[in-house]
Curated annotation (Swiss-Prot):
PANTHER family: HEAT-INDUCIBLE TRANSCRIPTION REPRESSOR HRCA (PTHR34824:SF1). InterPro entries: GAF-like_dom_sf, HrcA, HrcA_C, WH-like_DNA-bd_sf, WH_DNA-bd_sf, WHTH_HrcA_DNA-bd, WHTH_transcript_rep_HrcA_IDD. The gene is hrcA. Negative regulator of class I heat shock genes (grpE-dnaK-dnaJ and groELS operons). Prevents heat-shock induction of these operons. Pfam families: HrcA, HrcA_DNA-bdg. Coiled coil: none annotated. Keywords: Repressor, Stress response, Transcription, Transcription regulation. It comes from the Bacteria. NCBIfam families: hrcA (TIGR00331). This is Heat-inducible transcription repressor HrcA. Belongs to the HrcA family. GO terms for molecular function: DNA binding. GO terms for biological process: negative regulation of DNA-templated transcription.
């Protein structure tokens, strides 16, 4: 446990270092702390011994360690003010007509990345918490067709596929009927289970050759089990982390899993400082904010950046963007659920 003065010294060093990225000496703190330079140096030495500060190689000053940033986040972090120009740009960015949910999610991810200079990711509702509420097959030609799936009565998913060579005209209707009878209305986890257990047995009753039918089921439904994730600002990772992190950001399903694991069921927001079990994220900071997607559940907005980021500004920005996102989604779903056709 550190004293109140030591806590104030650590907070000031964090604030000064994130602004200048230069080591902080006792003289720089003397006008801000009502203590002598010797007392401040003594407290800085104690903070260093606790692992909260570390020496710079080229200066007598000190800078926060990863543990120091973590202590600051857990004990002293509060929201900073947002520049009026930043706020204006954010509000302006969300003033657009969205034609689908993905438009809104992508815009939020881009704005968080653009305003911070770091990497941003946004996730839709967790697949396991969604339900299959609609299914249809539209035959496009004698050789190909389009499967149209609906999740939570609002999110469409389309899959174009080649019709198996041994399919007869009625077989697409049979496949559609199996889905309607056995999978429609079920949550995604149940759909996954039935595709592995029940559906193969049912397919045997209707089809002589079953392998390609089961392959087709897998092809059509595999998208249900993938996270919907948008990542912006990947290239920035080369500056604040390195090649391993940059390459990891392309593995979007693994990234989505790491983001979900950073936040417990009860938490609405979290700041993870160099504390991820994923090696590619072990030396970066991961800020995650949970936001409501009306009628469907919660999505996640995340910022990935360096341990020495400006936490007050970053947390304030992710909160503001999260709030603007919630308002935009509320209006979007209100429009979807309204009778917007007018008869004159």
């Amino acid at each position: 446990m550190i004293t109140e003065r030591q806590s104030n010294i650590l907070n000031l060093i964090v604030d000064l270092f994130t602004q200048t990225h230069e080591p902080v000496g006792s003289k720089a703190l003397q006008s801000l702390i009502a203590s002598s330079s010797a007392t401040i140096r003594n407290d800085m030495a104690k903070l260093e011994k606790l692992g909260l500060l570390e020496k710079a190689h080229t200066s007598s000053g000190r800078m926060p360690s990863a543990a120091g940033f973590k202590y600051f986040v857990e004990h002293s972090l509060n929201l900073g003010s947002i520049d009026e120009q930043d706020l204006y740009q954010l509000v302006k960015a969300f003033d657009f007509e969205a034609f689908k949910l993905e438009d809104v999610l992508l815009r939020a991810s881009q704005m968080l990345s653009d305003t911070t200079g770091y990497t941003a990711a946004i996730l839709d509702v967790e697949p396991a918490r969604q339900r299959l509420t609609g299914f249809d097959i539209v035959q496009l030609s004698s050789h190909d067709a389009l499967a149209v799936l609906s999740l939570d009565e609002s999110k469409p998913l389309t899959v174009q596929f080649a019709i198996p060579k041994n399919f007869m005209n009625r077989d697409l209707l049979v496949l559609k009927g199996i889905v309607a009878d056995r999978l429609l209305g079920k949550d995604v986890m149940t759909v996954h289970y039935k595709l592995r257990t029940e559906i193969p047995q049912i397919v045997q009753k209707y089809f002589t050759v079953t392998d390609n039918v089961l392959d087709l089921f897998d092809y059509i439904f595999v998208g249900l089990f993938r996270e919907t994730i948008f990542v912006s600002g990947k290239v920035a990772a080369l500056d604040y982390a390195g090649l391993a992190t940059y390459q990891f950001l392309d593995e979007e399903q693994r990234l989505a899993l790491s983001i979900r694991q950073s936040l417990s069921e009860e938490e609405m927001a979290t700041v993870q400082v160099a504390d991820s079990s994923e090696p590619a994220l072990a030396n970066v900071t991961l800020l995650t904010y949970k936001f409501l997607i009306p009628y469907r559940g919660f999505g996640l907005l995340s910022l990935i950046g360096p341990v020495d980021m400006d936490y007050r500004r970053s947390v304030s920005l992710i909160n503001v963007i999260g709030q603007l996102l919630a308002v935009k989604l509320r209006d979007y779903y209100r429009y979807l659920n309204s009778n917007h056709y007018e008869v004159h």
